[in-house]
Amino acid sequence: MVKKSDIYVLSGLLVHEGDWSYRSFADRLHVPHPVVQRGLSRAQDADLYSAEQREVHLPHFEEFAIHALRFVAPAQLGALMPGVPAAWAAEPMASAIRSSGAEPPPVWPYARGQVRGQAIEPLHPAAPEAVEEWPEFGELLALLDSLRAGDPRVRRVAEDLLVSLLSEWAGERKR
């Protein structure tokens, strides 16, 4: 059974460029290396990852993210607290969705966060720290959070952006 932390690991792998070891990749994600090893093992069992090619199966990841993620890893908006903008409050969703500003933005709770908003649990507690150093990773996680917690309109926009992004990455892999 795929866990939220496994999707976090796969998402990082999608964005990561170049060679990696379990330990170096875990450091980049701000998680212990067994989280990466176990996550990729479960992802391989679910046909989301190929250990032989050391890459995420893009069509399977896309299908899982769009159709299953919100059921496997649902997210609810919670209490007001400081944090890092998440879901539709973070790029690329923030540019694609116009907010009325009446509702507080979704945030990942984070002591050093600069935005006060409604808490949303990230796919992994290390996400706020990891995206400070890795903005591209944060963009993918924002799309996934929008699929997990957004209303139908937000989910449609996130789906379109995710499909476009994954298609772009698939084209780059073929080169």
Where are the regions that the model predicts?
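Short alpha-helical segments that sit at the start of domains
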Residues: M1-G12, H16
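Short alpha-helical "recognition helix" segments of helix-turn-helix
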Residues: S21-V31
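Helix-turn-helix DNA-binding helix
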Residues: V36-Q37
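DNA major-groove recognition helix of helix-turn-helix
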Residues: L40
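A short, conserved structural fragment
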Residues: Q44-E55
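Accessory beta->alpha helical hairpin/"wing" motif in late/C-terminal subdomains of nucleic-acid enzymes
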Residues: Q53-H67
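A short, Lys/Arg-enriched interface patch at domain edges and termini
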Residues: F71-A75
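Long, low-complexity, charge-rich intrinsically disordered regions
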Residues: L77-R175
